[in-house]
Every structure is written in C-alpha cells, then in structure tokens.
Amino acid sequence: MGQKVHPIGIRLGVVKKHNANWYADPKQYSEYLLNDLQVRDYLRKKLDNAMISHIMIERPTGAAKITISTARPGIVIGKKGEDIEKLQKELTKMMGVPAQVNIEEITSPDLDARLVAEGIASQLERRVMFRRAMKRAVQNSMRSGAQGIKVELSGRLGGAEIARTEWYREGRVPLHTLRADIDYASVRAETTYGTIGVKVWVFRGEILDGMDSVYNPPKEDKTRAPKRRGRSNSNRRNSDRANTDRG
C-alpha cells in the first residue's frame, strides 16, 4: 500500500505538516482553496528561476502569511528588498487581505525532492542523456547526506518511438515506514519529443520523536557546566612526590 499512496499524504500528521494552515467556514472553504492554488501557480511562474520548493500559506484573522522555501533567496528579495515589496503588494491584491511574505533558505538543495526533480527536468530539456542526468542527481544527493534516493522517468526517453519507464535507486527508500522522512516530488519535462515525467523520492532518515522535533527542534543549552573546586591532577601528583621525598 505504501508504494501506491502519495508518500507525503500518508505521513501528514505523523512526520509531515500541511502546506496550508487556516480554518474557514464551509461556505468560504472552496474560495480559500482556489485562492491558494492561484497564489502557488502565480509564485512558481513569476519566480521560476528562484528554485522554489515549498510554499506555506497561513491565514490569521484579517491577514495572510506566505512562507517561500527557496535555494536562491536573493532572487526573491531583490536589491534592497524591492522585489519582495512588489510581491507583497501583488499578493495583497490577489488575496484581498494584507499579505506578508517570508523567505526560508534551503541550505541543502540536493536533499529536496522538488529541486532535484526540477534539475533533472531542466537537463532533459537541454538534451542531456537521461541516464547521465539520473545518475548525476542520485550521486549528488547521496554525497549530501541522503540515506536513499529513487528517480523514475516515464515517456519517450532518448527520442524512442515507444514510451517506457526507467528508474534508478541507491540506498534504501522505506515507503511503508511512516516515521521515515521521505520527500517526494513529480515534475514534467517538456522536450522536443514530448512530455517526460520525472518522479523523485529522497529518504533523509527516520524521525523517532515525531514531527515536532523537525519543525520545532529543541534549542541547545549554551550554559557552561560549573567548574569543580579542588586540586587538579597535576597538583596532586606534585604533592605526592613531595611526600615520597620527605619519607
């Protein structure tokens, strides 16, 4: 069953959180949901070169908060924050409430399934050999600390007349284990021969303490341990030597 269901959907509430956090009346639910889809499509088209992974949308009372996870925060922010201010004004018009945009930097893009899939898709569109693109992405992810990764391509691979599916995997990807931190993404590559589907699974380890340990990690205690009073080992050795000399 774990191989058929969406890897992120089955882990919601266990080790994964929703990409939207808001409550609405039954009459407004469909309106908010459609607005979320429009906002996500708008941001991905406008910031297509910013390497965006996730877009978190929150709706507190009378406002909206949008958190963009990107590997290139400088492109989103712009010079002196000019681009992000324009973005906030446009999103305010779209959502009908004051919108606040926050940027979250992705420090390890090779461990993000969305960014890995988009990288493979861009290589396929530039006519790079599909096996080379798959192996390069897998090697980079394993080198960055992934415990397992699987890449699957479907379509007219290499310009073949008959479409087929090929996949490549390294490490382990336990789809049935709910505590496994597995990131998943599917992207389409528009090539001259047609559309090629790219699917990526990245296994980043197991989460034993639940999703709170991922989204709210405990702060490190920087207080120093109190120093012990008393003589050090060197002083004890010197005193022992003095006693033996006296004896």
Curated annotation (Swiss-Prot):
- Keyword Transmembrane helix in record: no
* Gene label: rpsC
Classify the source by domain of life.
Bacteria
The protein's name in its UniProt record: Small ribosomal subunit protein uS3
Q: Which Pfam families match?
A: KH_2 (PF07650), Ribosomal_S3_C (PF00189)
Q: Per the similarity annotation, which family is this?
A: Belongs to the universal ribosomal protein uS3 family.
Please tell me one Gene Ontology term that the record gives under cellular component.
cytosolic small ribosomal subunit
Gene Ontology BP terms? translation
Q: Which purpose does this protein serve, as stated in its record?
A: Binds the lower part of the 30S subunit head. Binds mRNA in the 70S ribosome, positioning it for translation.
Q: What is the lineage of its organism?
A: Bacteria, Pseudomonadati, Pseudomonadota, Gammaproteobacteria, Moraxellales
Q: List the molecular function annotations (GO) for this entry.
A: mRNA binding; rRNA binding; structural constituent of ribosome
